[in-house]
Each structure stands twice: as C-alpha cells, then as structure tokens.
Amino acid sequence: ETPDANNHYNCPIVTSYAENIKNNMEELATEHINFMNPFLALDNEEALKSRLFEELEAQYHLTADEINHAVDKAYAELSQVRTDIQNKGEEVLAYLAETGRTGIVLCGRPYHIDPEINHGIPELINSYGIAVLTEDSISHLSKVERPLNVQDQWMYHSRLYAAANYAKANKQLEVIQLNSFGCGLDAVTTDTVKDILTKSGRIYTVLKIDEVNNLGAARIRIRSLISAVRVRKKHKIEPKPVSPAIKRVEFTKEMRKNYTLLVPQMSPIHFEF
C-alpha cells in the first residue's frame, strides 16, 4: 500500500485475537463449534489461495477453482471499497474548496468506527457544520518525505502519516486523532503526527477515548479547536508546509575518538542491527 515505507506489518494484537478467543471462550467446546483460526498472508494473493485450499478442502470439499474464484472476487471488492472511500474523500475536498468550509480528518484505528467505541464523536463534529473525513480517504493524495524519526513499518501508521502530511498543507483541513491507551503503538503515532503538523504551524488535537462515555471533555476540545481555527482565519494565518524528513547523522570512524555512544538496554533482537 505504501511502497516507500520501511515495512508493512499488521497489528500483532489483532492477529492474536483469534488465539485469545480460542483459549478463553468455553462455548467453543461446550457447543461443539468448529472454530478455525489459520494464519493467512493477505498481502500475497497466490499464497492466500493455497492456504485456504489447505484449510477448507478437507472439511468442506471445496475445489481449488472455487476458492481461487472466491479470492479473486474478494480482492476485487476490497479494491473497489478502497476506491469508493478515496473518491468520496476527493468529493468532500472539492466541496470544501467550493464552499470555503472546514473539514476535520478524524484519524482513528479501524475499531474506532464502532459507535460504541468512538462515542458519537463523528456526529458531534458534524453537528458544528464541519465535514468529517477518515485518514484513508485522503492518504492516497500525499507521499510523506522520509526518513521520519520513527521506523515506519505498520500499514495503518503509514496511512496516518500520509493523511497528516496532506492536511498540513490544506488550510481547510484540521486533524483530530482518536487514541486508545490500550494500544501501545499509538504512542508512536501521536508523537509523529504531532511532529508532522506542528512543524508546519498546524494545530494537533488528540482525544483519548478509552472507557469514557461522557462527551463533555471531547466537546470542549473540539470547540477549542474550532475557536482557534476561526482566530487563525481572522488573522489570515496560513500554513507553511515543512518537510518532516530528518537528516540522520552517520557515525564515522573519526568520531570514535571524541564521541560517546549511549545505548539503552534492549532485547537481543534489537542488537542484531
């Protein structure tokens, strides 16, 4: 999805959900449910077809042709869904440009789409007459200048950085990031997205939404952002895009005489490199 990113891993917690369900839900045994949780590589279409045939052929007597056809249809639909989301994002951007109104890129992980988790924040923003866009509706419109100050190796993160990079140069867009403290990797994204935006003189807002049913605090933060945006427009403060790329200093042999390396204690795998 992002060829120039360092890698394209998926969330390790999400990939372990099936194991968690298998080991903790007694109903699977008592109700005699056939619970299948094979590990599948979704980034390799041919490998996925092969693995699904291995898993499904014996139990459901499906042929390789049937599985191949189903996988082809699934990937076509996935591509179409992504295209639909991107087209809608471009449509909203065109509307904002035509009307001069403001839009907010509400960045969140896939599970933040669930109303039980986001607590109606998208609807709250809409109630102020502001358009809401997701990060994957605009991330295709920008490429982040690299290297960043983090290892950009998670697909969602790459999408998030690209969306922030696009928003920093568009004066009609603001960014609000939904953050769940249960996700350790989000601690990396909040700092990096903030860095991308604030370097260009933009406002960064993060809403920590874990276990909070009262929208009062979120409402105050959103109103504060809207007020700040109005003040900036009144004073004609324009964004000044700055590249988030950093220039790494290479440690040379000559530096060994006068420099000291501070190396934090890490696990053995970190020291392989």
PLM feature segments, named:
Residues 1-273:
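An N-terminal assembly and electron-transfer interface module characteristic of large anaerobic redox
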